[in-house]
């Protein structure tokens, strides 16, 4: 984990809210020169704090109308099961997020699909994996709401 200064946090906050701004524009907002911002952004990219830049696409506008979360249990927790399971998830375009869990369930998956029929097909495909013991689905009823990363209060002087 990189040690972040107050200026780093200010730069990250501006980029989080609008990654299309120039270094000069960011500098105006954080009280630094464009070249100083450029150097700092390059360091934040190099150390992995800035993991990338991407467009935020509205899933519903491109026809991905249904969000489904899946809770999954595997037959065990060894790498012989988890590695091929995660490789399968990586190869499925409609699985956009997953994480391992502590507790009753082993994984939480997030699917974006065109409709419940496509969601049912993915559920069947999931259950066909030999390492999957069980899965339970939760269909989201309305558009998920997201908030930006909470950067307030982070960083040193």
What would you call each of these model-derived segments?
Residues 1-157:
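A compositional/biophysical signature of low hydrophobicity enriched in polar/charged and small residues
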């Amino acid at each position: 984990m990189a040690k972040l200064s107050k200026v780093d946090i200010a730069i990250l906050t501006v980029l989080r809210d609008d990654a299309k701004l120039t270094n000069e524009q960011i500098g105006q907002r954080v009280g630094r020169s464009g070249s100083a911002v450029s150097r700092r952004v390059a360091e934040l990219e190099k150390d992995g704090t800035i993991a990338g830049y991407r467009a935020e696409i509205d899933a519903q506008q491109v026809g991905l109308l249904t969000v489904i979360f899946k809770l999954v249990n595997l037959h065990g927790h060894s790498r012989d099961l988890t590695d091929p399971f995660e490789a399968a998830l990586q190869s499925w375009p409609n699985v956009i997020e997953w994480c391992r869990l502590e507790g009753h369930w082993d994984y939480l998956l997030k699917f974006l699909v065109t409709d419940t029929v496509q969601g049912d097909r993915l559920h069947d495909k999931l259950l066909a994996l030999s390492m999957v013991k069980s899965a339970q689905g939760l269909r989201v009823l309305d558009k998920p709401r997201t908030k930006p990363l909470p950067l307030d209060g982070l960083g040193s002087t």
